[in-house]
Amino acid sequence: MNLKLLKISCMFLLLGSGNAAYSQLQEWSAGFRIGEPGGFMARRYSDNGINALEVNIGTYGGLWGTDRKYQDGTFNNIGYSINVLYLWHHPTIINSDLHTYYGFGPQLNSRDWYANKASNNLAATKRASAMGATAVGGIEYFPIDAPNLSFFSEIGFYTEIAPNPFFFHLQGGIGVRVNF
């Protein structure tokens, strides 16, 4: 009797775990990030279960880099950012509830900066709109008790293409997503 119960338990465990792993990656997810850039994101998973397209809208320079040299002046404030990332998403071998992802895409920023005026030591405010490339890598956890939620941590970088080529900015953060 114990062997039969063990076989039935194993069968339900295997069927249930496959269904749980499949249900974690829904078609869409939306959430927020605390970090750089901070804000809201929406993600659309592809049918192959590996790729995703993510759009992030939020702040730029809020966590680190608020007071930083830029061209012939400095940033002294928080700006706005939007980026679109093409991602590759994989469950880890250690735990199917733990996924890794990485990707890249374009990023647009808008931020005030203060140009130095050598003649009278006053700063003139200018609006800097910039375009560049961003890359990211992260880890995401899908709790078994809350299959529609996921928690993530990521790190990446932004390098500006225009107007200040090769301006480098570290990015990353933590956040939560709702999968639906």
Question: Where are the predicted features?
Answer:
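Gram-negative (and chloroplast) outer-membrane scaffold detector with strong preference
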Residues: S46-F151
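Outer-membrane beta-barrel "beta-signal"
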Residues: H169-F180
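Membrane-embedded beta-strand positions in outer-membrane beta-barrel channels/transporters
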Residues: S29, G39-M41, S81-L85, T134-V136, ...
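N-terminal beta1-alpha1 ligand-phosphate binding loop
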Residues: G35-Y45
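Membrane-spanning beta-strands of outer-membrane beta-barrel proteins
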Residues: L25, G35, N77-G79, A130-G132, ...
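Bacterial Sec-dependent N-terminal signal peptides
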Residues: M1-Q26
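Outer-membrane beta-barrel porins/channels
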Residues: A135, Y158, A162-P165
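Transmembrane beta-strand segments that form the barrel wall of outer-membrane beta-barrel proteins
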Residues: Q24-P37, I50-G61, S153-I161
